C-alpha cells in the first residue's frame, strides 16, 4: 500500500486515549491529539495497532545483526496529523536529536518496540528506539544517522 494512502487512512481515524502506561508523547505541530489538540499520548497497545514493520540491520551498539519491529515513524506522525519540517526526538536521559522530515519520508525509519522479537527494557535501549535501516544504504552508515537513532525514546516534538 503506498505510504501516502496509508498515511491518509491513519489520519482519518480519531486518536484514542491511552488505556495503559504512556510510553510516547507527541507535541508541537499536530492537529489530532488525545490530550488536547496539540498533545498526543501513546501506550504500547496503541503503537502495536499501527502497521508493524520489521527491519534487520547492524548498529554500532551491537555486534550482531538484529531484527527490529515497530510502526514506521511516518505512520506515527500521520496518526497525529503532523505538519512540521523537523522532529525533535527526546530520550529518557533527556538526549535530544533533530531529525528532518526528509529522512522520515526517504527512509523506512521505524519506532522499534521489539528487538529480535522481544520487548526492549530500558537497559536494552528500550522501550522504544528510533531505528534507521542502516544496512540498506552506505549513506546511512555514518555518525550523522547513527546519532539520529534515539534509544529510550519518550517524546517527539514536531516543529
Region locations from a protein language model:
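N-terminal intrinsically disordered, low-complexity segments enriched in P/E/S/T
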Residues: 13-159
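Bacterial N-terminal signal peptides
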Residues: 2-9
Amino acid at each position: 500500500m503506498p505510504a501516502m494512502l496509508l498515511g491518509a487512512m491513519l489520519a482519518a481515524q480519531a486518536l484514542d486515549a491511552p488505556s495503559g502506561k504512556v510510553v510516547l508523547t507527541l507535541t508541537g505541530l499536530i492537529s489530532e491529539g488525545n490530550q488536547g489538540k496539540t498533545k498526543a499520548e501513546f501506550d504500547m497497545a496503541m503503537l502495536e495497532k499501527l502497521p508493524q514493520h520489521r527491519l534487520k540491520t547492524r548498529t554500532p551498539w551491537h555486534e550482531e545483526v538484529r531484527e527490529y519491529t515497530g510502526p514506521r515513524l511516518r505512520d506515527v506522525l500521520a496518526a497525529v496529523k503532523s505538519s512540521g519540517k523537523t522532529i525533535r526526538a527526546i530520550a529518557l536521559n533527556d538526549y535530544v536529536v533533530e531529525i528532518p522530515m526528509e529522512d522520515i519520508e526517504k527512509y523506512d525509519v521505524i519506532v522499534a518496540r521489539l528487538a529480535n522479537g522481544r520487548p526492549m527494557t530500558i537497559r536494552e535501549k528500550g522501550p522504544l528506539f528510533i531505528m534507521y535501516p542502516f544496512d540498506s544504504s552506505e549513506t546511512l552508515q555514518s555518525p550523522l544517522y547513527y546519532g539520529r537513532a534515539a534509544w529510550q525514546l519518550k517524546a517527539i516534538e514536531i516543529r
